[in-house]
């Protein structure tokens, strides 16, 4: 599973996931299912915010150009992917500026158009069950919840899905593709079932060819959202080294 994750996701997402796990004392090489889940969640958060801006009239617009108009403002503030100290600094700044209620738990995004924090969920189970778990944990009507599944289902607070249908379809397609890639390599069952995961871990530890037989379909285009985060945690030399290592692995 670890090798699959490194092949399937953008190297910068993988690096962020590793940093997040190590911050909590977790090992990506051992807790590989969690590693995959964190990478998936990060990618969904970045895809959620990609290309969405607010124009000078306060209207939400979609711009896919690499050099948007200077008058445009990013619609979403990305909180997920930052270390806890920086994340809370961002949250406190938003609350002080906008007057919104400070959440008890770190949310994933802030929507400047709707003036609300957003909690993103990606589940391998029924969306309504995971939604209720999130709602019971957060216990706040101020934080908007949006849940996606690997089967194309979604659920959001008051059926308000925030994004346009096409943007949500991109996320659903990506999740479905991840599921299909896992299933084709016998990894999906272990991703869903903890018991199967233990068996798969033993199998993974015996593997001698980390790059063999793994998918190579990964986007080399850096997400606009990732570009805004990159200066905070990675310089250009580290980025180049990661990408060089990734391409070398592909050629084997």
Curated annotation (Swiss-Prot):
Active site per database record: 80, 108
Gene Ontology terms for molecular function: RNA binding
Name of the protein in question: Protein PA-X
Marked site (Important for efficient shutoff activity and nuclear localization) residue numbers: 195, 198-199
Record's keyword annotation contains Cell cycle: no
Lineage, top ranks: Viruses, Riboviria, Orthornavirae, Negarnaviricota, Polyploviricotina
Protein's job: Plays a major role in the shutoff of the host protein expression by cleaving mRNAs probably via an endonuclease activity. This host shutoff allows the virus to escape from the host antiviral response. Hijacks host RNA splicing machinery to selectively target host RNAs containing introns for destruction. This may explain the preferential degradation of RNAs that have undergone co- or post-transcriptional processing.
Biological processes annotated in GO: viral RNA genome replication; viral translational frameshifting
UniProt entry tagged with the keyword Chaperone: no
Site feature (Important for efficient shutoff activity) residues: 202-203, 206
Free-text note on domains in this protein's UniProt record: The probable endonuclease active site in the N-terminus and the basic amino acid cluster in the C-terminus are important for the shutoff activity. The C-terminus acts as a nuclear localization signal. The C-terminus is recruited to host protein complexes involved in nuclear Pol II RNA processing.
UniProt keywords, alphabetically: Decay of host mRNAs by virus, Eukaryotic host gene expression shutoff by virus, Host cytoplasm, Host gene expression shutoff by virus, Host mRNA suppression by virus, Host nucleus, Host-virus interaction
Compartment list: Host cytoplasm; Host nucleus
Family membership: Belongs to the influenza viruses PA-X family.
Top-level division of the source organism's lineage: Viruses
Protein source organism: Influenza A virus (strain A/Swine/Hong Kong/126/1982 H3N2)
């Amino acid at each position: 599973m670890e090798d699959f994750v490194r092949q399937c996701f953008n190297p910068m997402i993988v690096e962020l996931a590793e940093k997040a796990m190590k911050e909590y004392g977790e090992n990506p090489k051992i807790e590989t299912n969690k590693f995959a889940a964190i990478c998936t969640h990060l990618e969904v958060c970045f895809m959620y915010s990609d290309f969405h801006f607010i124009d000078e009239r306060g209207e939400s617009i979609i711009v896919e150009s690499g050099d948007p108009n200077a008058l445009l403002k990013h619609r979403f503030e990305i909180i997920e992917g930052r270390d806890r100290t920086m994340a809370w600094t961002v949250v406190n700044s938003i609350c002080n500026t906008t007057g919104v209620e400070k959440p008890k738990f770190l949310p994933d995004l802030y929507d400047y158009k709707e003036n609300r924090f957003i909690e993103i969920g990606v589940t391998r189970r029924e969306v309504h069950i995971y939604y209720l778990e999130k709602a019971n944990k957060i216990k706040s009507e101020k934080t908007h919840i949006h849940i996606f599944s690997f089967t194309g289902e979604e659920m959001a607070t008051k059926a308000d899905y925030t994004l346009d249908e096409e943007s949500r379809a991109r996320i659903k397609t990506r999740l479905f593709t991840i599921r299909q890639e896992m299933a084709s390599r016998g990894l999906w069952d272990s991703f869903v079932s903890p018991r199967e995961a233990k068996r798969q871990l033993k199998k993974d530890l015996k593997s001698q060819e980390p790059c063999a037989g793994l998918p190579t379909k990964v986007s080399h285009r850096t997400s606009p959202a990732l570009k805004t985060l990159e200066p905070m945690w990675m310089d250009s030399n580290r980025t180049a080294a990661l990408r060089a290592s990734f391409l070398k692995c592909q050629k084997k």
